[in-house]
Design a protein with these regions (language model features):
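Short coil/turn connectors between adjacent alpha-helices in alpha-solenoid helical repeat scaffolds
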Residues: 36-40, 48-60, 75-78, 92-107, ...
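Surface-exposed alpha-helical interface segments used for non-catalytic interactions
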Residues: 44, 57, 61-64, 84, ...
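Short coil/turn linkers that connect adjacent helices within long alpha-helical scaffolds
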Residues: 14-20, 33, 53-55, 73-77, ...
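Solenoidal tandem-repeat scaffolds enriched in leucines and small polar residues
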Residues: 179-199, 209, 213-214
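Extended alpha-helical scaffolding segments used for macromolecular assembly and cargo binding
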Residues: 1-129, 135
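Helix-coil-helix junctions within alpha-helical repeat/solenoid scaffolds
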Residues: 6-9, 87, 112-114, 153, ...
Length: 370
């Protein structure tokens, strides 16, 4: 143990100017040296480095190590607060890895809420409620989602924080859209857009949805206009979203906005632009390991290729994306993904498969209003 403590000390001295690259090594040596609290602090630091690099799998492993050590500490308020800080980072990492669809994500946010309730005052309650709203939204429990969104809005209004207000409105417009309550959705989108500042608020996406609030408001505005038959306005709002996307700096935000643009260009019957945006979404998603935007982009890209004559390649891509979506437990937009795959199958000369896929999409919409 003494040797490990000495190695940790030597690393701290040698890399004093920048401890980030060796923080995981120091944590490991401190753990083996019996310095539990020091090891926890360095595992936390190493996880923050991994999160900044979008290395979510590495962050998860480091956070699990830290949490295992926290659970060996004597019960105290300080231990609860330390666990909560780690749990919040675990929520961020799981949300990115599973796009709020995995059971791990729901467990992480549920545990974080339990910890928040054990601490008298915490700035994390808003973030936890927001995460639980997103979990509810992705499982298509729209009423629960909107109720949690309004809890977020009450906290944001009490604090008067512009960034939290942006994200509270962001939480509300999604479930209202899927419930078909378009006036409420528009009201929250307008309020969020009025407050949004890219330099200040894009980075919030790491904790709030793994996508940019402004891009979401713009492309969902396009969806509302399309849903209500105002196709010209749908084009205008989608073009605003695409222009905004080119200014974004975080890869997850770019992948999300481009993937949704691909879906909406399908609705607008524009396979050329669907191909361009879906291809960008796929490129970023594959490079960074984003499953949700990867399968959205795959189906949209497949449809766009089939619609332009590359039917074999297109239907193969669309099938791959649909299979990944179903394996992942995706519900939102499942019926549109089915429509794109069905059309690609029809164009490729597979009418029986097309009919089967289309019937599955109709059943999905009947169940989830997705």
């Amino acid at each position: 143990k003494l040797l490990h403590r000495r190695v940790a000390g030597a690393l701290e001295h040698a890399f004093a100017a920048d401890l980030d690259p060796v923080s995981a090594q120091i944590a490991s040596h401190l753990q083996l040296g019996g310095e539990t609290r020091g090891a926890i602090a360095y595992y936390q630091r190493a996880s923050e480095v991994a999160l900044r690099l979008f290395a979510y799998d590495a962050a998860l492993a480091l956070l699990e190590q830290a949490l295992t050590l926290v659970h060996t500490l004597p019960a105290s308020t300080a231990a609860i607060e330390t666990e909560l800080e780690l749990q919040m980072r675990l929520c961020t990492a799981w949300a990115a890895v599973t796009s709020y669809l995995g059971k791990e994500t729901e467990r992480a946010y549920t545990r974080a809420l339990e910890l928040c309730q054990q601490v008298q005052q915490t700035p994390h309650l808003f973030t936890v409620l927001w995460g639980l709203h997103e979990v509810a939204l992705y499982r298509t429990d729209y009423r629960a989602s909107v109720e949690l969104a309004h809890q977020c809005l009450a906290i944001a209004e009490e604090l008067g924080d512009p960034g939290l207000l942006v994200e509270a409105h962001h939480a509300a417009w999604g479930p209202y859209y899927f419930m078909g309550e378009y006036d409420h959705a528009f009201a929250h989108m307008r309020a969020g857009l009025d407050l949004y500042n890219r330099q200040q608020h894009e980075a919030l996406s790491a904790d709030f949805g793994v996508h940019d609030a402004c891009a979401c408001a713009l492309y969902e505005s396009a969806l509302v206009h399309w849903s209500t038959g105002r196709l010209d306005q749908a084009v205008v709002w989608l073009e605003r979203s695409v222009a905004h996307t080119r200014k974004l700096t975080m890869p997850a935000n770019v992948a999300d906005a481009d993937a949704y643009a691909g879906l909406i260009y399908h609705l607008l019957r524009d396979p050329v632009r669907a191909q361009a945006t879906a291809d960008r979404a796929m490129t970023v998603s594959i490079e960074k390991g984003y499953p949700y935007t990867r399968f959205l982009g795959s189906v949209a890209l497949g449809w766009s290729l089939a619609a332009q004559g590359s039917t074999a390649e297109g239907v193969a891509l669309a099938r791959q994306g649909m299979a990944a979506s179903e394996e992942f437990g995706q519900r939102l937009h499942h019926s549109q993904l089915a429509a794109m795959l069905a059309e690609a199958c029809l164009l490729a000369g597979h009418p029986v498969e097309a009919l089967d896929v289309a019937e599955g999409g109709l059943a999905s919409f009947a169940l989830y209003r997705d």
